[in-house]
Amino acid sequence: MSLKKKKILDEIIRVNHAGEFGAQQIYAGQIKFTKEPELKKTLNKIAEEEDEHLSYFEDLMIEKRVRPTLMSPLWKLGGFSLGAFTAILGKDYVMACTEAVETIIVDHYKSQIGQIEEIEIQKKIEKFLNDEAGHQLTGMNQIKNNDFKLKVFKKFIKIITKIAIKVSQKI
């Protein structure tokens, strides 16, 4: 593998690990602070899939000798806080957050597939992309009042997610 291709693969592994770590933190905050039993059940199911994704990228980081992002402490605090905040605001904000983050992640994973030469990694990312698309649909389908405030909130979350992706690739 050329140095350029190794650098690209390292960035993909690092950013995907960071994203799954951040998602895990968001769901942990939401699960801890939500008061709705059915919502908590849905979030636990999603969190289980995110745990599988995170575990895969943790193992891959060790195998490929890729360092994690230096932003992990910030992503831990920020993700958990975002999760707690949305849970306090209620189900629509929890689901809007899920929809917004997963919309960006689906596009992000799609953009990576053609850059990866290793078939096993490519297939895992395709599987995770399908999982994330399912989370995105769950979010979209469970929002009851998609008003102006919620639309602005989703736009804000999408911007933050894109920034986190760019930063995590490099730092």
Residue ranges and their predicted role:
Residues M1-I171:
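Non-heme di-metal
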